[in-house]
Amino acid sequence: MNIQALLSEKVRQAMIAAGAPADCEPQVRQSAKVQFGDYQANGMMAVAKKLGMAPRQLAEQVLTHLDLNGIASKVEIAGPGFINIFLDPAFLAEHVQQALASDRLGVATPEKQTIVVDYSAPNVAKEMHVGHLRSTIIGDAAVRTLEFLGHKVIRANHVGDWGTQFGMLIAWLEKQQQENAGEMELADLEGFYRDAKKHYDEDEEFAERARNYVVKLQSGDEYFREMWRKLVDITMTQNQITYDRLNVTLTRDDVMGESLYNPMLPGIVADLKAKGLAVESEGATVVFLDEFKNKEGEPMGVIIQKKDGGYLYTTTDIACAKYRYETLHAERVLYYIDSRQHQHLMQAWAIVRKAGYVPESVPLEHHMFGMMLGKDGKPFKTRAGGTVKLADLLDEALERARRLVAEKNPDMSADELEKLANAVGIGAVKYADLSKNRTTDYIFDWDNMLAFEGNTAPYMQYAYTRVLSVFRKAEIDEEQLAAAPVIIREDREAQLAARLLQFEETLTVVAREGTPHVMCAYLYDLAGLFSGFYEHCPILSAENEEVRNSRLKLAQLTAKTLKLGLDTLGIETVERM
């Protein structure tokens, strides 16, 4: 149920009947304050200006044509021409009933699209670090939301599995295997990469061998391809452990590494030359873009092939966008890549559009995000100033959550405690990130994220168990409850019901903008409204069975909405805390 869409259409029709143009925007929004109703139509100002009349005069004319019979109990004009809409309690009650009768809580499915989501993208032969966290979990929340809405989502894990460093890594892997009688367990990927680099820098003979190996790998030699595959396998096996711990839906099947696009690169360079987009400049192949200017104010040159014949990230990104449209049949492509890559992506996409590889009708969207900072406001590092490994961060989250839940549940069994600590610890790390607007940097703070008050995972998980506990105490007959009507008489009942029915609107925003913090804010608000409702509208001690059952149904829809909302974020719920 999308009340905003329903009201927008009704107000738009009334505006047209009052003389507004057919493309007028009613600007129906959820009201910020209760006294302004549940929704507000703010579009009169802009349209009245075009029509040369006072906004309030237009609003009055719109009201004469606005039929919200059975939807609103009151409609009024406020200020210079805002239209405040108060939803009818009977309308709310009917739609709460419908939401409870549906597995999807009444959420409609929009027209199905094929959407490619590019996220996570770790590098081969390196351990995942905190810099990969935001892309991985924000991207996964977007994927879960889009899939719930019925879209065909293709996860694209753009792994860094190609480049000149692979000569050095294969040479080092070969040396290790010889010394360890062919047995090789790469437990410490970070150390492996560091040692390979040290040898490369200090041992000229080793460096020469590494350079030869790059050439052999790139020419398709089977032995070197096999060694390369081994490095990819070891890395992705380790990464999968991290994905599973994070409750992220990526699997090995979603890997679409840089190497996938290698065969396309020569053809793309040749095609861009043939189309007159790419030219030779100082031995390199360059595309000059008028949209981007260099320091001298001239069109910026974007290199797509170096003097030595090597390709660049831009070339791969051009091939990648082309592949996603032509081979994967994407109708929309979302990239969860940090904001520092913005210009690079815009340049690649400008070339993609000029070359006609992806039509303008297919959006390429950079859903960028800021950095994760320490309490000092600087990039999050270890005490020694090194990069924080993601596995270490999750270990610490688990350890802190164990202490926290053991303190609150001294009698809980070890198994239960471990499950609860896992849900709370991992949930806390994810929710702390997801609840912030992705476009900004955020401060990583253990105390805040593990707090049981405020907009945190522990608070949301606790809020969910609190609603469930009402049902345990009620000892209700599910069938009897399903048949009971919902009656809304109190203001707090109406406020809770209206917010519950805004779940679909929230999902729509997350799907459109790729902003999971909007879902977090909605769920936090919902938990707060339930708290006020629970305090002021007795459930188990209600004045009669009819009111008791109706309030139980509001509590039931609250629990289902909290659970489903947290699920779209990839946050686990628990039955007891």
UniProtKB/Swiss-Prot annotation:
<dbReference type="InterPro" id="IPR035684">
    <property type="entry name" value="ArgRS_core"/>
</dbReference>
<dbReference type="GO" id="GO:0004814">
    <property type="term" value="F:arginine-tRNA ligase activity"/>
</dbReference>
<dbReference type="InterPro" id="IPR001412">
    <property type="entry name" value="aa-tRNA-synth_I_CS"/>
</dbReference>
<dbReference type="InterPro" id="IPR036695">
    <property type="entry name" value="Arg-tRNA-synth_N_sf"/>
</dbReference>
<dbReference type="GO" id="GO:0005737">
    <property type="term" value="C:cytoplasm"/>
</dbReference>
<dbReference type="Pfam" id="PF03485">
    <property type="entry name" value="Arg_tRNA_synt_N"/>
</dbReference>
<keyword id="KW-0436">Ligase</keyword>
<dbReference type="Pfam" id="PF00750">
    <property type="entry name" value="tRNA-synt_1d"/>
</dbReference>
<dbReference type="GO" id="GO:0006420">
    <property type="term" value="P:arginyl-tRNA aminoacylation"/>
</dbReference>
<comment type="subunit">
    <text>Monomer.</text>
</comment>
<keyword id="KW-0547">Nucleotide-binding</keyword>
<keyword id="KW-0030">Aminoacyl-tRNA synthetase</keyword>
<keyword id="KW-0963">Cytoplasm</keyword>
<dbReference type="InterPro" id="IPR001278">
    <property type="entry name" value="Arg-tRNA-ligase"/>
</dbReference>
<dbReference type="InterPro" id="IPR014729">
    <property type="entry name" value="Rossmann-like_a/b/a_fold"/>
</dbReference>
<comment type="similarity">
    <text>Belongs to the class-I aminoacyl-tRNA synthetase family.</text>
</comment>
<keyword id="KW-0067">ATP-binding</keyword>
<feature type="short sequence motif" description="'HIGH' region">
    <location>
        <begin position="122"/>
        <end position="132"/>
    </location>
</feature>
<dbReference type="Pfam" id="PF05746">
    <property type="entry name" value="DALR_1"/>
</dbReference>
<dbReference type="InterPro" id="IPR008909">
    <property type="entry name" value="DALR_anticod-bd"/>
</dbReference>
<dbReference type="GO" id="GO:0005524">
    <property type="term" value="F:ATP binding"/>
</dbReference>
<protein>
    <recommendedName>
        <fullName>Arginine--tRNA ligase</fullName>
        <ecNumber>6.1.1.19</ecNumber>
    </recommendedName>
</protein>
<dbReference type="InterPro" id="IPR005148">
    <property type="entry name" value="Arg-tRNA-synth_N"/>
</dbReference>
<keyword id="KW-0648">Protein biosynthesis</keyword>
<dbReference type="InterPro" id="IPR009080">
    <property type="entry name" value="tRNAsynth_Ia_anticodon-bd"/>
</dbReference>
